[in-house]
Amino acid sequence: MNPDVIVIGAGFAGLSAASALAERSVRVLVLEARPTLGGRATAFTDPATGERVDNGQHVMFGCYHETFQFLRRIGTDSHVLVQRQLTVDTIDRAGRRSRLKCPVLPSPLHLLAGVLTWDALGWRDRLAALRIGRAIMEVPRRLKPALYTSATSTRWGGAGASGRASSSAGAAERTHRNGRLDGLRRAGTVERTRRAEQQLETVTVREWLKAHGQTPRLIELLWEPLAVAALNQPIDIAAATTFVAVLAQVFGRDPRSASLALPLKPLDELYALPARRYLEQRGGAVETGAVARIDVSADAPNVMVGGRPLRARAVICAVPWYALAEVFPDRPAALSAVLDAAAQTAASPIVTVNLWFDRVVTDQMFIGLPGRTMQWVFDKRTVFGEQASHLSLVSSGAASVVGRSNQELIDLAVHEVRDALPVARSAVMTRGVVVREKRATFSVAPGQPPRPSIETPVPGLFLAGDWIDTGLPATIEGAVVSGHRAATAVMDVVR
């Protein structure tokens, strides 16, 4: 085929970009270096059980609007279960069970109401939640783009009398003056927002929470699990900037924005394989095992795969930050700033331990384990509608444990499961599989280099990926947002 656009990388970013272009009748060729699609969000077959196992447990939120748009496009949105209201069961380190259940109220009142009735908290903790409630309500407004505006133009009509004309002129002058004042106010808002963001970049999530009067108990049970799950970094390390952006997204106007959404299929069945079918049905093509290199010596992106030249009107490079240098081995001067930033970007790992038991140990889809190394446990077969015995335990921001041996991690996971779930103490663990993603996400610690934009200095070359500057952390939604934005930018080239 002679593609209009080449997409390099077949994760959420690359496939969402490719499918969005195919939807607009653009011929797309997707190149993936690995033998399978999905990038860092994929699945493999466990040789002992024959089951498809995700390379990490991925949880979404109800506010992942562009992700759901992508899944609707490829016909798999029904394979995600979205809670009607945010409900989270937890078992703390003392073995106490509790449930956070948020009623259907306008956001963030639903969260405050849920916290106020959460039996795991004391009144001091609940009062602390009220104190931060106002800050949460202000977050979305603060983070909206503050645009500079010019004076409002006035459409003049034919005034039949001088009095009416004078009145119209006075109204126009007032409109002009108010427009200038509004522009100054918005400019001031922009400057205040910039200053606030700069301050947040130097403050950790824990420091920000303490500054808003949050108690240790509330931090451990609510804010730390949310922050670590979203940012994949301990709250003593992660900068508050991205966490505040997460609050703006999760606690938007729709109370279901904060609801958890669980895939009901392995990740390759959820999006990778359906996206491939979608592309091929629309005249596109997907190649795996295709190691692509880009040469921009002629001020345009020229793609090579194993010595085979490929030409297209535009190229989207949707590889992770740590793989960018491999795609541009000649290190073009026009991309030196982006390549330097990518090379200096640190990574944060995730460890997932899959355990199989000889009997049912829980009837719940997922349970939070605050204060433990394994922060969440998911019953995979309950999620997939089968008999339960396969648990997936997740440790996000796992720099402190990623270097342990497989057996040490399995022993740790078994200990924490049995500590939290008494039924598991009499169950026999029949198999354990450890999945390490050492570079699961980019770091959001203070001092990281700036994230690049979709556009590059090279005409016809665009970037996509969860590490692109979307304002979101390294999430599925961040990847899809970048893919859709890249597709929109490409349409200006291929129209």
Set out the residue ranges of the language-model regions.
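Mobile amphipathic helical/loop "lid" adjacent to a hydrophobic cofactor/ligand pocket
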Residues: F68, R72-R73, S78-A240, V244
